[in-house]
Amino acid sequence: MANITVIVPVHKLEQNYIVGCIESIKNQKVKPFEVLFVTSDDKELNDYLGKYDFGNLKGVTKIIKNETGNYDFQSQINYGVEQSTGDYFTFVEYDDEVSPIWIKNGVEYIDAYPEVGVFLPIVYETDENGKFISFTNESVWAKEFSEEIGRLDNNTLQKVQNFNFDGMIVNKETFLENGGLKSNMKLTFTYEFLLRMSYKSIPIMVIPKLGYKHTNNREGSLFVEYKSTIDVLESKFWVNKAKKEYFFTED
């Protein structure tokens, strides 16, 4: 059975969100191989997690302070992957939740499709109140949307950018060998990563089951704070930059 590490990047304590995130991981039908909370130097956050009752996850959970001092999302994920010991990893943003079948689905699909380097979930997008907004990533299962049904390819990514990799399950070796996430990509790091994988002919597959609930455009999130400061021209700049960045595996 595949070993899947769950990484939770968290830079500050927002108790009302983080409890839901942790409990959703505790409720997995298949227990993750390990759970890593990658934290900042926020004392309140680290004290809270240190006292949390992780229940059935207690023996596999570690709280790791990011010693680099870089707490942006990409750096937190990269640090967590470097510290992980599983063959595969996934991540959950601390204000999101995963469905009880997510790790189970991951294990089953890794066993069935060992050639795939990146598995994406179908993402259930909600607002801050939990109200449904839309699904993301499900379009690759529509007839003639992509070159192969269920797979995300380069030609499709050139035409469509709005895919979400939250909750993706990735082969750790593939991730590290190909440069991880780029911290210099402030807005389109999701798109750049998927595009880079496709250019390197690393298979990307969407698991055709709901796996991840994402709180979209939450007030106070790092992504929304940054996005609110840019205009249309800068947004276009980041998309074009993502299309050029795949030539390089490191910043």
Question: Model regions: which residues?
Answer:
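Short, acidic, metal-binding catalytic loop of nucleotide-sugar glycosyltransferases
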Residues: 23-32
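Glycine-rich, basic loop-to-helix element that forms the pyrophosphate-binding segment
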Residues: 67-84
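Short aromatic/hydrophobic "clamp" motif used to bind/position activated sugar donors
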Residues: 89
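Conserved donor NDP-sugar-binding/catalytic core segment of glycosyltransferases
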Residues: 101-135
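Catalytic beta-strand/loop signature of glycosyltransferases that borders the donor
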Residues: 122, 204-211
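A recurrent flexible, glycine/aromatic-enriched loop bordering the glycosyltransferase active site
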Residues: 148-170
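Acidic donor-binding loop at a coil-to-helix junction in glycosyltransferase catalytic cores
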Residues: 186-193
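Catalytic core of nucleotide-sugar-dependent glycosyltransferases
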Residues: 210, 214-217, 223-250
